[in-house]
Amino acid sequence: MEYSRDSAEMMMETKRNVYSLEDNKIKRHKSSDLSFSSKERKDKLAERISALQQLVSPYGKTDTASVLLEGMQYIQFLQEQVKVLSAPYLQATPSTTEEEVEEYSLRSKGLCLVPLEYTSEVAQTNGADIWAPVKTPTSSHAFNLSSSNSPFQ
């Protein structure tokens, strides 16, 4: 068993070395062709690191490793804050069936929600005439009691 593990490790090491040699050749080839753009990339990276340094520790360390480490720690802190603050809202609600919903619904009790504007007249009455039918004429001519053809004379 020991022999097979050692040979597997040696094979992996060999593979790594082959890939790293190929990568170095590719990197050298690219760097000679794109030296100007890599300078621009380095400048952009430096600008962004300094902006991050201003956010994370404006009066502290200025080396890149410290700035990135503090940035990572601050992001982790913010992620934990999001978890803590959103935990009450993300708690699993028990699944309810339609029967349970109807048991607690207003319609099952013969009630419904009405906008407040519609209830102002009801609030001003004594309650006795709420269910009384409202007698409003459909036309002024239809309910003229003084006319000769009225059945209520």
Curated annotation (Swiss-Prot):
Natural source organism: Arabidopsis thaliana (Mouse-ear cress)
* Keyword annotations from UniProtKB, A to Z: DNA-binding, Nucleus, Transcription, Transcription regulation
Primary location group: nucleus
Which family does the record claim for this protein? Belongs to the bHLH protein family.
Q: Name one GO biological process term.
A: response to gibberellin
Q: Where in the cell is it found?
A: Nucleus
Which molecular-function annotation in GO is an example for this chain?
protein dimerization activity
Q: Which residues form the bHLH domain?
A: 29-78
Q: Which gene encodes it?
A: BHLH154
The protein's superkingdom reads Eukaryota
This protein's name: Transcription factor bHLH154
